[in-house]
Amino acid sequence: MEAGRIDRRRRYTLSVIREAFFALLAEVGFAKMTVADICRRADINRGTFYLHYEDKFALLDALIDEALAAAPPLEGTETGALCQRPPANDDYYLLYLDDDAYARVAQRVVERSAEQMVPSIMEESGLSREDAYLLFVHNVQGNLAVNRLLGWKRGPKFAHAQELLVAYSEGGLRAISSRHDSRSSS
């Protein structure tokens, strides 16, 4: 019985921290937000915050991971598909709109997805792991930047941009692959 109460309190605390974070992200942005601001908004003390998170960056990383986990599952191994999944709810959109938070979103997408995507690029192109990783990072950063520019709004413009990016990526991989094949056969 006591464990259920503690778990309920913990869930409540994490919930008010999360709500305070997203409210402040919308109002002042990540760079200007402090742990003290989050605690004031959540009506908790700093000690309580630090029981759950090391700092505001750890909170941001946890919320980014939550947002990525809430997105529809990734089908296939195309980098474009990875970056076409819109945020699952309005709070998560804020992570993509804030300049400082967005940089960490892109970093986390790369960290969480490289293991799945880089071997696929290597197989398709014949590139080394290092070179395939460079292409993967380029594709993630570029796709996310274009989606951000378009406001993640679905529609004809978004669909056209995705088609263009996929054609560009696939054409580039074909060119690299054929270049690699011609060097191998020489």
What spans do the regions from the language model cover?
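Hydrophobic alpha-helical connector segments
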Residues: 72-103
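Alpha-helical structural segments
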Residues: 15-23, 27, 41, 58-81, ...
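Acidic-glycine-rich active-site phosphate/pyrophosphate-binding loop
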Residues: 113-123
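Hydrophobic/aromatic-rich alpha-helical bundle segments in the mid-to-C-terminal region
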Residues: 121-186
